[in-house]
């Protein structure tokens, strides 16, 4: 069978601004849960209305007037969701305040924090959006076994059986499989399901590993100091692990290789991310449809793209400084250069930095 290499899925892990419209399309396994029109990005584009899409992997917002202004926020980056009173530019002149959704996020492996504020035009839309975001966020947090490699976990029962996940089916159980991660190797059991491969030691079920197909870069057989072995390599975002397993005889090893490669390929075509959402009767989950993916973006490219390539730094617009979810923001102070009271500028930044315009070349 032809070997198929997996790819890093960034959609649920990263925060990106103003991406190409192709990157806003739903990927395999991504499901649109809700679509709310007339949602204002109050912090970064105050006064500009747009569309918010909630999927099982991320939040997607784009401006209605210029779809190239957009945000994609992966659930793995979101650290908190709150509902607060705020005043948007649209309603400020009428003296009206709205409930807004505050999304707190953090870039993985860094201390950089972001704060996003989204405001809807009516209470019904706000409630629907807030409830959906909160529910999907909780669902994502509680289903990491579908998407992350786990070692020495508690997914094996005392009797040596695997704790099955929802939507998971055991395909094959193989005894007498050696894990080659130690000098002498450890004898154990290999369990193959439609979602992952699991190995655990016969003498110690706490010594185990669970490898979802979504984390796999490649599956192959190659030479090791123990002889020919089944080698699982994980993607960069999954730690780039190289896991070796040996099973005899060679024919049995080849059959194991074909089974895992086949399931890996099938899972890449239709991944199971584990994030589910029970909608109300009046609502309807919208799965991926090619015809629907394009409607959020104008695909007609203009000859002149100056307006599309110039935008104030999106990073600075949403940068949350050193505030935590419970911190109170500092009161405004007088800035002599402007003659106005402004929020204190964070250490390391200047007034000039805040006015600087970044041009993509």
Curated annotation (Swiss-Prot):
Purpose of the protein: Component of the BBSome complex. The BBSome complex is thought to function as a coat complex required for sorting of specific membrane proteins to the primary cilia. The BBSome complex is required for ciliogenesis but is dispensable for centriolar satellite function. Required for BBSome complex ciliary localization but not for the proper complex assembly. Required, redundantly with bbs-4, for cilia biogenesis and both the assembly and movement of intraflagellar transport proteins along the ciliary axoneme. Plays a role in the removal of degraded mechanosensory receptors within the cilia.
Species per Swiss-Prot/TrEMBL record: Caenorhabditis elegans
GO molecular function: phosphatidylinositol-3-phosphate binding
UniProt keywords, alphabetically: Cell membrane, Cell projection, Cilium, Cilium biogenesis/degradation, Cytoplasm, Cytoskeleton, Membrane, Protein transport, Transport
PANTHER family: BARDET-BIEDL SYNDROME 5 PROTEIN, BARDET-BIEDL SYNDROME PROTEIN 5
Family affiliation: Belongs to the BBS5 family.
Main location per the UniProt record: membrane
The protein's name in its UniProt record: BBSome complex member bbs-5
GO cellular component annotations of the record: axoneme; BBSome; centriolar satellite; ciliary basal body; ciliary base; ciliary membrane; cilium; non-motile cilium
Disruption phenotype: Single mutants do not display any obvious defects in ciliogenesis. Double bbs-5 and bbs-4 mutants display a defect in cilia structure and function. This is characterized by increased accumulation and mislocalization of intraflagellar transport proteins and impaired movement of intraflagellar transport proteins along the ciliary axoneme. Double mutants also have defective polycystin-mediated cilia signaling and mislocalized and increased accumulation of mechanosensory receptors pkd-2, osm-9 and odr-10 within cilia.
Protein encoded by which gene: bbs-5
Record's keyword annotation contains Zinc: no
Subunit structure: Part of BBSome complex, that contains at least bbs-1, bbs-2, bbs-4, bbs-5, osm-12, bbs-8/ttc-8 and bbs-9. Interacts with bbs-4 (via C-terminus); the interaction is direct.
Entry's Gene Ontology BP terms: cilium assembly; intracellular transport; protein transport
Classification via InterPro entries: BBL5, BBS5/fem-3, BBS5_PH
Compartment list: Cell projection, Cilium membrane; Cytoplasm; Cytoplasm, Cytoskeleton, Cilium basal body; Cytoplasm, Cytoskeleton, Microtubule organizing center, Centrosome, Centriolar satellite
